[in-house]
Amino acid sequence: MVRWTLWDTLAFLLLLSLLLPSLLIMFIPSTFKRPVSSWKALNLRKTLLMASSVRLKPLNCSRLPCVYAQETLTFLLTQKKTCVKNYVQKE
């Protein structure tokens, strides 16, 4: 069995301290990358939070009641789709 001297141990630790940061830079970011779907979900969550903080004007749609409230973006989109469908059906 080979015994390491003090100089061998210090040289190994010095080499390890020089290589370890580059190894961390190479391997750690790839393990922490989020999938694209989670980024989209995060962006949607931010958008919904922004939309919920905006006070809305009443909807100009004859078949739907006018709504004054803080609503989410999804609610707005469904109301707009319903309004467009009703408008197309009338013509």
Curated annotation (Swiss-Prot):
GO molecular function: enzyme inhibitor activity
Effect of P21S: Loss of E-mediated host lysis
Annotated GO biological process: symbiont-mediated suppression of host peptidoglycan biosynthetic process; viral release from host cell by cytolysis; viral release via suppression of host peptidoglycan biosynthetic process
Xref: Pfam families: Microvir_lysis (PF04517)
UniProt KW keywords: Cytolysis, Host cell lysis by virus, Host cell membrane, Host membrane, Host-virus interaction, Membrane, Transmembrane, Transmembrane helix, Viral release from host cell
Source domain of life: Viruses
Reported effect, K46A: Delayed lysis onset
Effect listed in the UniProt record for changing P21V: Loss of E-mediated host lysis
Transmembrane residue ranges: 9-29
Periplasmic side: 1-8
Topological region Cytoplasmic: 30-91
Protein's membrane topology: Single-pass type I membrane protein
GO cellular component, one term: membrane
Alphabetical list of InterPro entries matching this protein: Micrvir_lysisE
Subcellular location: Host cell membrane
Miscellaneous comment as given in the Swiss-Prot or TrEMBL entry: Most of the references in this paper show that residue 89 is Arg, in most other phiX174 proteomes the residue is Gln. We have chosen to show Gln at this position.
Subunit structure: Oligomerizes. Interacts (via N-terminal) with host SlyD; this interaction protects E from proteolysis and stabilizes the YES complex. Interacts (via transmembrane region) with host MraY; this interaction inhibits MraY by blocking lipid access to the active site. Part of the YES complex composed of 2 host Mray molecules, 2 lysis protein E molecules and 2 host SlyD molecules.
Task of the protein: Induces host cell lysis. Inhibits the host translocase MraY activity that catalyzes the synthesis of lipid I, a necessary step for the host cell wall biosynthesis.
The family this protein is said to belong to: Belongs to the microvirus E protein family.
Protein name per the record: Lysis protein E
Species assigned in the record: Enterobacteria phage phiX174 (Isolate Sanger)
Gene that this sequence comes from: E
